[in-house]
Amino acid sequence: MPELPEVETVRRSLEQELVGRYFVALRSLGWPKIVDTHSPELFAEAIAQRQIQQVQRRAKYLLIELDNHETLIVHLRMTGQMLVVAADEPADRHTHVVVALDNGRELRFHDPRKFGRWSLVDRSGVAALNQRLGPEPLGDDFTLDDFAQRLSRKATKIKPTLLDQSVLAGVGNIYADEALWLAKIHPLRSANSLNANEIAELFEAIKTVLRNSIEHRGTTLVNYRDAYGASGENQYHLEAYGRTGEPCRRCGTPIERIVVAQRSTHICPVCQA
């Protein structure tokens, strides 16, 4: 599933293509369940001739703000892609939503697994989303003191705590592994067992791995692409995730795969002991 760096990379590419443009018409909605707030007919009517004001991100969600104060919230889930292409470019069978733009291009949603969702909401819908999410780890409201307080209230293991979107918004399996490796913390440690120095190390590690991945335009393992269909490059810079059996770049010990909270997890058994 795309995590914060991937969704931020998509956001930036969509921003270049969409801000100031108009949704002209819904060309097709091949899988109606993708839009979970409106029928196809009402959705088509609601977005027609609406100008795009901003493209923002909250956690793993894209927020496309329209000129009538409504917002299209897009959750890519496992395999969703938001692509902006020429209208004459052929669409394959996994393209489930096509929206015409006023410059002759199209916004397309490509999703082989069909788990992605579009929700057209008013301001209260955006507020409800914000209310259930924790702070943005690259935002000003992510402070060391607040992070320490949140961890102190959690007796759960640190790995699933980092994946809890009400604790921290946007971190998923890849970057939890990467941050814990960088901070030299074992993922099975209880969140409330970390001392002040460990919390500070993890706080900085989370920001570092996310910023580095954004710089590399995200991690493409299978499906992730930006709005131009381009892959990310962060998969070539991972330290722990997906590197089972390969040497730890700090100590040379083979990276091991374990399961934590039913999630595949990658650790250095020496550095993170």
Swiss-Prot record:
Q: Which reaction does it catalyse?
A: Hydrolysis of DNA containing ring-opened 7-methylguanine residues, releasing 2,6-diamino-4-hydroxy-5-(N-methyl)formamidopyrimidine; 2'-deoxyribonucleotide-(2'-deoxyribose 5'-phosphate)-2'-deoxyribonucleotide-DNA = a 3'-end 2'-deoxyribonucleotide-(2,3-dehydro-2,3-deoxyribose 5'-phosphate)-DNA + a 5'-end 5'-phospho-2'-deoxyribonucleoside-DNA + H(+)
Q: Which cofactor does it need?
A: Zn(2+)
Pfam families (UniProt xref): Fapy_DNA_glyco, H2TH, zf-FPG_IleRS
List the FPG-type zinc finger ranges. Answer: 239-273
What the entry lists under NCBIfam families is as follows:
fpg (TIGR00577), PRK01103.1 (NF002211)
Please give the function described in this protein's UniProt entry: Involved in base excision repair of DNA damaged by oxidation or by mutagenic agents. Acts as a DNA glycosylase that recognizes and removes damaged bases. Has a preference for oxidized purines, such as 7,8-dihydro-8-oxoguanine (8-oxoG). Has AP (apurinic/apyrimidinic) lyase activity and introduces nicks in the DNA strand. Cleaves the DNA backbone by beta-delta elimination to generate a single-strand break at the site of the removed base with both 3'- and 5'-phosphates.
**The protein's name in its UniProt record:** Formamidopyrimidine-DNA glycosylase
Phylogenetic placement of the source organism: Bacteria, Bacillati, Chloroflexota, Chloroflexia, Herpetosiphonales
